[in-house]
């Protein structure tokens, strides 16, 4: 009799647990059991729960190194694909760690370039620890390059002598790819190479936050290089971060900003952006079809216009 079997099954389950009990997998009981002669070591439930990463927030950053001059304006001197993961505790939804996967996709510069990340709006005290992963050894070895301009600390993975949170990403980008400075990589000219990813894992001091400590709007990726005999490195930041100035070890030269006007030498675009091929200007008004994105120039002049310019490339002039 099926009905009788179900009744006996229910009675059996009631018999093996009290009204506040629970049936759990081996090693996952949420009930505290004191140690004793009959209970052995007892049981202390794990209150932390397991962590799970959220779906990544993904963007691509492209840079032009001729700031504040136009040059070839092809925005492939450094190309970064960035994914941000928030590792949350399943039980509480608290954010424990924030992971940035920074992939170096291209190096189209004719001079040595470094890459850094300043995280605005937070303090070093907000970070318990920084760890690295992925292809981190390739990136970290690039800080040994004679072209490196970062005061890199190989214990904290941040930059020394800067009160802000500045995380060096690459001392010299060509070095990460294993080629000499000036060699074009993944731009349609020069060599085609594997992309490499630097995982930056930031463990938070406050382990009870449910809202992210920082987001894309705080990620100030920049490129830098030696300019003539200047002691400070020359930095190229996204237009949105010009108001923060340079990092402690860098300069952006106010006269350069005045000359630049509304133009930009670094942009954040949707992930997987198909950047211009080498020597192809991102946008031209005289011969639009000879550029990569004819609408870009109008967006750069007024950012309320042509906001989807990146969806309308000249196919033969873009890479990827």
List the predicted regions and their residue ranges.
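Extracellular distal adhesion/interaction modules in secreted or cell-surface proteins
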Residues: 1-320
